[in-house]
Amino acid sequence: MQIISTSFRFWKNSRISHVWKSLKRWICLSALILSGAFFNRQDIAARRSLFMPVNRSVPDVAQKRKNWNGLISGFKASDLVFLDGSGCNTDMTRRYAYSLGGSRAVDSAPLSKPKSTTILSSIRLDGTLRYTTFSGGTTVERFKRYLETDLLPHLNGNSVLIMDDMKSHHAKAVRNLLDSSGVRYIYLPPYSPDLNPIEKLWSKVKAFLRKFKARTLNALPNAIQNAFHSVTISDCSGWFRFCGYAL
C-alpha cells in the first residue's frame, strides 16, 4: 500500500507524459509479480480453501476442543471406534470430467430420485468397517438396532466408541443400551468433523459411488459394498493420523 500511495503522489505532481510512462512501468511490474513463474519461485499454489465453522471459535467450543486432546490421549488409537452416518442416492455422479478444449464436460443424472439411502458405519485403526444401510433418515430406533446387531457384539471392554452430537446419538435409549453393554463411549466436541477420521471414509466412499453411478435402488447396495471393499488398512491408518491420533 505504501508503494501505491507513493506512486499516486508522484503522478499527481508530474506531467501527463511522465505519468503515462510511470503507469506503464507499474503495469509491467504488476504483471511480473503476478506471473506464474513468480508464484512457482515462491512456492505459492492455488489450493482448495479449508472452511472452518464459525462456531468453532466460540469460547465454550474452543475449550471443549482443547480438552479433547487431553481426554483422547488416555486411550490407545487401536481401541478407538468412530461412528457416524451419511446419505447417498441414485443421482450421484462425478463432479469433474475431461473434455476437449473449448467444449464443456457433460454428464447425466436422473432428475427424479427415490428417498435417500442412509449408511451407518464404524471405523477402526485396523481397517475394520461395520456398516448397515436403510431407506430414509436415522431414527433412534434404527440407530439402536444398528448398535445391538452390527456393532456392539464386536466390541470389548477396551473399546471406546466415539460419536458426534447428532440427536439420535444422545437419546436416552441409546445411552441406556451403551451403559448396559459396558462399552465406554464419549462424544466429540461440537463443530469438530476434523477430529473424526470417518469423514475421510465418507469422502472415499462417495467418490466411488459417483464413479459407479448406480442408477437404481437394486444396484445401489452392490455399489456401496464395492465402495467399502475399496477402503484399505493404509487408508484408515492415514485418516487416523491426519486427525491427530497417535498410532
Residue ranges and their predicted role:
Residues 1-32, 74-76:
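A short, amphipathic alpha-helix used for macromolecular contacts
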Residues 22, 35, 84-86, 121, ...:
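Generic structural signal for small/hydrophobic residues in well-ordered secondary structure
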Residues 24, 60-148, 245:
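Extended, low-complexity cationic-aromatic segments
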Residues 26-27, 89, 138, 161-174, ...:
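Acidic, metal-coordinating catalytic cores used for nucleic-acid/nucleotide bond scission
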Residues 31-43:
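Major-groove recognition helix of helix-turn-helix-like DNA-binding domains
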Residues 34, 77-80, 198-247:
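C-terminal anion-handling pockets and recognition modules
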Residues 104-112, 181-197:
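RNase H-like polynucleotidyl transferase catalytic core
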Residues 164-165, 172, 186-210, 218:
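RNase H-like two-metal-ion nuclease catalytic core shared by retroviral integrases
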